[in-house]
Amino acid sequence: NRLEFKKLKNGATLIDDTYNASLDSIKSSLELLIKREGKRKIAIIGDVLELGTFSKNLHEEIGKVLLNSDLDYIITIGNETKYTDEYLKNNNYDNLKHFNNENESYEYINNLLKDGDLVLFKGSHGMHLSNIIKYLVDNQK
């Protein structure tokens, strides 16, 4: 999906931008997140797929972009975003959590979100982040 907004029962707003991902599209989506109103701004970032040998460098670059985005919390999901997570930790960013796949993250994200949160979901379509959004919409109390 491309920039679809969904309001949860608990008052959190999700930004579903899970159709595709590149460094530039992640930057654009983060700019949108930063400009909008929200008590807490949270980014949930999945792998950018099909990068081959460039993957580690690009996912570290994503870490740099996230570090400079003044976010309240970051969640990374996938095998390649471990490089994003490592970059953030090495630069003393502590408000983050990494999951190897989306199935591990459902309950954690569901429990994390609160009224007023603005949450960006961004990653390659093959990362299935849209499944998390569907779960949250269906299971939010």
State each model region's role.
Residues 1-141:
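ATP-dependent carboxylate-amine ligase
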